[in-house]
């Protein structure tokens, strides 16, 4: 079962989100394993049966920004009271991480003991490596004028209440042989 839902703050969006929460509560009650890649209220806020194992695989590649408990009370983070009310990132039995060098930062961000972090690598990286050549070929087929140019991808992470600085980066690029591609966070 896969449940994907974002909170749309309209009345209809709130109702649909609530329906997804109820649906996920049913599946949490009837499953033995839950794999999650973000925060989900039904996982963190509810008490679950002992046989349920919750595995957090997170959705980023590595730990390059402060998030979760590391950013509480900061401009880009949640208010501590809000995080406490939502029991932010609670009930994870295991966390799948990349290299052990990131463990300290994952433990801080998710408020978990490092012994719960399993360094199995990140599935997303395997996919990107396996498809690298075909993705490159497709890209240059679509944009043949970029062959031979240096290409820089700027893909800023999402931060609420903070503006992206990609305009400044574009202005700083003074070289004709450098192409900057901006891909904003969804």
Residue ranges and their predicted role:
Residues 1, 109, 119-186:
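Conserved catalytic-core segment of nucleotide-activated headgroup transferases in glycan assembly
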Residues 1-130:
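Active-site and donor-binding regions of nucleotide-sugar-utilizing enzymes
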